[in-house]
Swiss-Prot record:
It comes from Vigna radiata var. radiata (Mung bean). Disulfide bonds join C4-C21, C8-C23, C16-C33. It holds the Pfam family Albumin_I_a. Residues 39-46 form a propeptide. The C-terminal glycine may be removed from A1b. GO terms for molecular function: nutrient reservoir activity; toxin activity. Keywords: Disulfide bond, Knottin, Seed storage protein, Signal, Storage protein, Toxin. InterPro entries: Albumin_I, Albumin_I_a. This is Albumin-1.
Length: 89
């Protein structure tokens, strides 16, 4: 079994040095590794995180932007909310 602990980057491929683990971002470039067996808790955490998203509509509902930018990593099932009019882009 993979050791799904520690810090990670959502840009790492595979995240957490194993395809059995997932990286949950807590900031745009950093996060923590988890074992995806607890998917309901992961889904809840994504729902509650103000910037994690799976769609533009989700960003609008959360009030954290109007564009869900997907991570360029096929191991990541979500993206980060941005305001498309933002200077940050």
């Amino acid at each position: 079994a993979a050791d799904c602990n520690g810090a990670c980057s959502p840009f790492e491929m595979p995240p957490c040095r194993s395809t059995d683990c997932r990286c949950i971002p807590i900031a745009l470039f950093g996060g923590f590794c988890i074992n995806p067996t607890g998917l309901s808790s992961v889904a809840k955490m994504i729902d509650e995180h103000p910037n994690l998203c799976q769609s533009d509509d989700e960003c609008l509902k959360k009030g954290s932007g109007n564009f869900c930018a997907r991570y360029p990593n096929h191991y990541m099932d979500y993206g980060w909310c941005f305001d498309s009019d933002s200077e940050a882009l």
